[in-house]
């Protein structure tokens, strides 16, 4: 099934502070309905996922916004990006599933319109995963030192279902 709860883990890098990461359920909401009705118009399963994503962002110090490169930029991506910007958190737009795509530069230009730094990756093939951990660590505050177990600072991963959030965590 589709997870509606947050899944939490720890990113450990030799010689660097550990940091927590929160994988949220995939957000499937109709962007038009969200714009016209707002989150209070959403009910049931989708409401649970949205609440968990909101809670993850409130607890986080940064966001990895995961999008599916094969699908291109969708209205829901634009809605979520606007919402993330309102939260004011440092954000990296992770464009997953770019392996084998032609015109990658054009695709990245499309996502560049969201206004976040971009990193193309392929969680399935391990492309740019090491760079991803470095970029995510760079989003943490400069004075961050992991002295707590689990780490006090967390990064939230948001995006649509099947964008590859969990695959990146597991890579």
Where are the model-predicted features located?
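Conserved G1/Walker A P-loop phosphate-binding module
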Residues: 1-59, 67, 110-113, 135-171
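Active-site-proximal flexible loops/turns
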Residues: 12, 30, 75, 103, ...
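Conserved Switch II/interswitch segment of TRAFAC-class P-loop GTPases
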Residues: 42-47, 57-79, 88-105, 120, ...
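Proteins enriched for Cys/Gly/acidic motifs involved in redox and nucleic-acid/cofactor modification
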Residues: 80, 128-129, 163
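Canonical P-loop GTPase G-domain recognition
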Residues: 89-92, 97-154
């Amino acid at each position: 099934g589709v997870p509606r709860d947050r899944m939490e883990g720890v990113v450990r890098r030799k010689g660097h502070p550990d940091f927590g990461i929160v994988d949220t359920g995939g957000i499937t909401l109709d962007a038009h309905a969200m714009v016209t009705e707002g989150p209070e118009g959403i009910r049931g399963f989708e409401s649970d996922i949205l609440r968990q994503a909101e809670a993850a962002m409130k607890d986080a110090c940064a966001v990895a916004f995961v999008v599916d490169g094969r699908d291109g930029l969708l209205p829901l991506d634009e809605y979520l990006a606007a919402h993330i910007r309102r939260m004011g958190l440092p954000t990296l737009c992770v464009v997953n599933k770019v392996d084998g795509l032609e015109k990658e530069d054009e695709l990245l230009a499309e996502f560049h319109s969201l206004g976040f730094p971009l990193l193309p990756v392929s969680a399935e093939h391990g492309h740019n995963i090491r760079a991803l951990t470095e970029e995510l660590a760079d989003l943490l505050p400069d004075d961050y030192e992991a002295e707590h177990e689990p780490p006090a600072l967390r990064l939230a991963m948001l995006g649509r279902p099947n964008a590859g959030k969990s695959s990146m965590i597991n890579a």
